[in-house]
Amino acid sequence: MFDTMTVTKAAGALIGSLLFLLLMSWAASGIFHVGTSGHGAEGEEHAQAYTYPVESAGGAEGEAVDEGPDFATVLASADPAAGEKVFGKCKACHKLDGNDGVGPHLNGVVGRTVAGVDGFNYSDPMKAHGGDWTPEALQEFLTNPKAVVKGTKMAFAGLPKIEDRANLIAYLEGQQ
């Protein structure tokens, strides 16, 4: 099956490939100066030369940190049309037609009791959360669902931008 010539060709290809990699490594280290930089003490990591301390945004302890505009102000100027675009992220699991998907339907969610859709199988932590889905409660939940309701089945990571949350809530308010 294998004759001497086939084995010789395979060995030559392997050795040639290794030689090529060795030469390319040697050429690259010559061009890009890979290795010690000659700066600092023996064994010092090069990356340490670029580290610097970062002070907290609040300055001294006890100072209030400006977190931007409050939610009520942003909600007052929210754009439901922009919220409809943000709702595209929700469509994979939620519907607005009154039928449940992977998640409960969101038709009439603003003002509804938390875990209040009859017949939907909510997680125990969501059932225990209680309260109503006010715009403020939705805003907090949509920031980071897993932090607000630990153990929720909702896999969504959250909406980091306050404007996106306000626009989405304004859109959902119109879907009553």
From Swiss-Prot:
The chain crosses the membrane at residues 12-32. SUPFAM superfamilies: Cytochrome c. Heme c binds at residues 90, 93-94, 126, 154. GO terms for molecular function: electron transfer activity; heme binding; metal ion binding. GO terms for cellular component: plasma membrane. It is a single-pass membrane protein. It comes from the Bacteria. Keywords: Cell membrane, Electron transport, Heme, Iron, Membrane, Metal-binding, Transmembrane, Transmembrane helix, Transport. The keyword NADP does not apply. The keyword Metal-binding applies. InterPro entries: Cyt_c-like_dom (IPR009056), Cyt_c-like_dom_sf (IPR036909), Cyt_c_1A/1B (IPR002327). It holds the Pfam family Cytochrom_C. It is found in: Cell membrane. Coiled coil: none annotated. Binds 1 heme c group covalently per subunit. Mediates the electron transport between the cytochrome bc1 complex and cytochrome-c oxidase. This is Cytochrome c-552. It comes from Paracoccus denitrificans. The lineage of its organism: Bacteria, Pseudomonadati, Pseudomonadota, Alphaproteobacteria, Rhodobacterales.
